[in-house]
């Protein structure tokens, strides 16, 4: 891609050097600007109710100032946090994921590219249109208007005021003009989310059945032909209502074979699944893990293998496994014909300054397998969590655990006085790996999709979904939290307790939803409309926030300069221009450094 862009840029340079670029095309590095005079008369007409526009501009300027202060503090505090505690690089912190380009950004799939481009177009039009209208409201001449292109991709629009004419306008008029773009972006955001949260998502319900978001390779479900996008609507002839209902019904069936009914669009089929206990993940420090750091040459378990027996007794479901391990703190697992023996419990890592770290023989970073607390058997991480719910901080408990001692596992007990976390819950002071001794398994083989969670978040029900109801919140708080929740949807797997990102209703996940009510006549078009509103709001809000960063050439930088000039002009100094430049340059460089740290810091400092 870099080679292509470089070749494209040199080709443009050659055309410009030979005078072959039309006068309406400008160049700033690899950025092309297309200039036009068309549209000025329309802006003159739109700007006629000047009293209204000035009132709107004053309101927007106040909003912009608040957001500017907020973004300044947020960026500085985030940069300081990254320097003090460099985070591990994640997909979100990859530089390419800063770009709002579907297919380049890992979180923006090509399947919703039309809706994203529509949202970007609307955002650019209302933003630059706001600048244009306020230029005419404040009697500032417009030199030209147009689009900015990176190669052939539209990345911006612009209204170019006549600079001499702009400087003649009063500071208040200039500030309103610079704030107009972000004000319009925020107004569009409110409008589209009101439509999305109201009539649009009010017409979308979750279809009955369990939503299959994925199937593990080599799993029982995969072998039976279950695919992503399927809905499991019945098990052994009994209807399935949702994901939780499927898990309950499967757990209640003792036989290895289950017959499931699957729907996908207009297709309905039945298939029989022979369950087998597939290892879907294993923590590296597990006593059963391949490549065990303790240096053992014993056989080990890897992801994708099947656990077929515990101490010679056949197992094929998670329920079987838990039952066979309930009375065995050390067990022998049969995997692909090989037998591996180890302690069974909740795999844990001792945390710095936690209660258990002060126990004899333990220090931060040590690995142990907790098998019992006060005599209560712990088979897996879920058992540990439910057992700890019965204790309070300050109580002393006896923790039974196994630690590695050379080539063998040593059983030890520790008396631990429990501490509390930020939520007031009792803690031992450990980081717990999921599963049994760090082994995660699936007897069925599907990864279920949180269709109801995503539907509720798209409807603005953030507090209902994650806040325990939220009934006491006012409508404004509920709306703002709903907007905040939708902003996180493209990164949901990293920011919420769900295993998927949500970029909108795409071909494979629309099978999980149904349309009802007066808008049902739109059919699948309602999903497209919901996507368009979602991405229009998402992009406009981010566009508004970004342009409020107090740094040139963003609108926030211009507003900062106007404000600085107004304050400095009242000070007893003859060097007002230099002081203003010092303020804006210092703030601008601080913002640039903060942004660079946010983008590249995790890769450079981790």
Question: Where do the model's predicted regions map?
Answer:
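Hydrophobic transmembrane alpha-helices and their immediate loop junctions
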Residues: 1-606
């Amino acid at each position: 891609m870099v080679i292509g862009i470089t070749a494209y840029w040199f080709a443009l340079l050659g055309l410009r050097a030979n005078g072959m670029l039309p006068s309406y095309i400008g160049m700033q590095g690899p950025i092309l600007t297309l200039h036009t005079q068309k549209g000025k008369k329309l802006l003159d007409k739109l700007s006629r109710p000047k009293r209204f526009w000035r009132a709107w501009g004053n309101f927007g300027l106040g909003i912009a100032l608040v957001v500017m202060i907020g973004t300044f503090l947020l960026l500085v505090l985030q940069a300081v946090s990254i320097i003090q505690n460099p985070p591990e690089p994640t997909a979100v912190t990859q530089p390419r994921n800063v770009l709002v380009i579907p297919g380049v950004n890992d979180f923006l799939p090509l399947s919703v590219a039309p809706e994203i481009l529509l949202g970007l177009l609307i955002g650019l039009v209302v933003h630059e249109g706001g600048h244009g209208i306020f230029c005419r409201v404040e009697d500032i001449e417009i030199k030209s208007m147009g689009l900015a292109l990176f190669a052939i991709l539209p990345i911006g629009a612009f209204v170019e005021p006549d600079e001499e004419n702009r400087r003649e306008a009063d500071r208040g008029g200039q500030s309103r003009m610079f704030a107009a773009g972000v004000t319009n972006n925020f107004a569009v955001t409110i409008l589209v989310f009101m439509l999305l949260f109201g009539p649009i998502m009010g017409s979308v319900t979750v279809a009955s059945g369990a939503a299959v978001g994925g199937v593990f390779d080599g799993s029982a479900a995969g072998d039976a032909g279950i695919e992503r996008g399927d809905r499991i609507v019945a098990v052994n002839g009994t209807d399935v209502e949702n994901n939780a209902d499927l898990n309950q019904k499967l757990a209640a069936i003792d036989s290895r074979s289950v017959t499931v009914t699957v729907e996908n669009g207009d297709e309905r089929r039945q298939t029989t699944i022979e369950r087998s206990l597939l290892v879907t993940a294993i923590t590296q420090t597990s006593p059963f893990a391949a490549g065990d750091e303790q240096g053992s040459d014993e056989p080990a378990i890897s992801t994708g293998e099947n656990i077929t027996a515990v101490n010679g007794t056949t197992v094929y479901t998670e329920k079987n496994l838990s039952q066979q391990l309930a009375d065995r703190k050390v067990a022998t697992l049969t995997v692909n014909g090989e037998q591996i023996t180890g302690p069974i419990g909740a795999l844990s890592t001792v945390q710095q300054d936690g209660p258990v770290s002060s126990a004899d023989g333990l220090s931060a970073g040590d690995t142990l397998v907790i098998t019992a607390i006060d005599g209560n058997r712990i088979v897996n991480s879920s058992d540990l969590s439910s057992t700890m719910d019965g204790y309070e901080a300050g109580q002393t408990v006896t923790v039974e655990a196994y630690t590695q001692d050379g080539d063998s596992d040593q059983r030890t007990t520790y008396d631990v006085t429990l501490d509390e976390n930020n939520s007031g819950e009792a803690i031992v002071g450990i980081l717990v790996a999921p599963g049994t001794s760090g082994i995660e398994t699936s007897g069925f083989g599907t990864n279920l999709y949180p269709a109801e969670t995503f539907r509720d978040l798209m409807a603005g029900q953030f507090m209902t979904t994650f806040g325990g109801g939220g009934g006491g919140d006012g409508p404004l708080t509920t709306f703002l939290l709903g907007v905040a929740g939708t902003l996180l949807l493209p990164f949901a797997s990293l920011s919420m307790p769900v295993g998927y990102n949500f970029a909108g209703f795409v071909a494979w996940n629309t099978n999980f939803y149904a349309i009802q009510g007066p808008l049902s006549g739109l059919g699948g078009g309602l999903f497209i409309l919901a996507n368009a509103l979602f991405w229009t709001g998402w992009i406009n809000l981010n566009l508004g926030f970004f342009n409020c960063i107090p740094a040139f050439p963003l609108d926030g930088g211009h507003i900062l300069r106007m404000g600085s000039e107004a304050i400095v002009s009242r000070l007893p100094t003859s060097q007002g221009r230099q002081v203003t430049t010092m303020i804006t340059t210092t703030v601008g460089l601080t913002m640039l450094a903060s942004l660079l740290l946010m983008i590249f810091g995790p890769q450079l400092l981790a």
